[in-house]
Amino acid sequence: MARTQQSFVNRKDKPIYISVEMWPECFELEPGEKLTLIWDAPDQGEAVQIDFVNDLELVVWPNGNAEDMQFLIDDKPARSRSWAFKHCDPATGNLR
């Protein structure tokens, strides 16, 4: 396994949502924020698959050993931000 890092930057003028599966974890990124995932990916083949749901949501499927995955937002630990949405009503999933 190779230690791998993948980052996503929100360059939009509104929040975006990134789900990391299989767990699931989901992060709301404010404009300008960067989410970085760090995990043990396979030495060969795809390290990650990314599915775009729409222009504000994507789903990330890391391959390899992701049990000890690190989640960083702007280079700071961010696991506590998973499912902590400011702009989305958790009951309906609609943006506020």
Residue ranges of predicted features:
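Asparagine-centered strand-capping/turn motif at beta-strand->loop junctions
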Residues: 2-12, 62
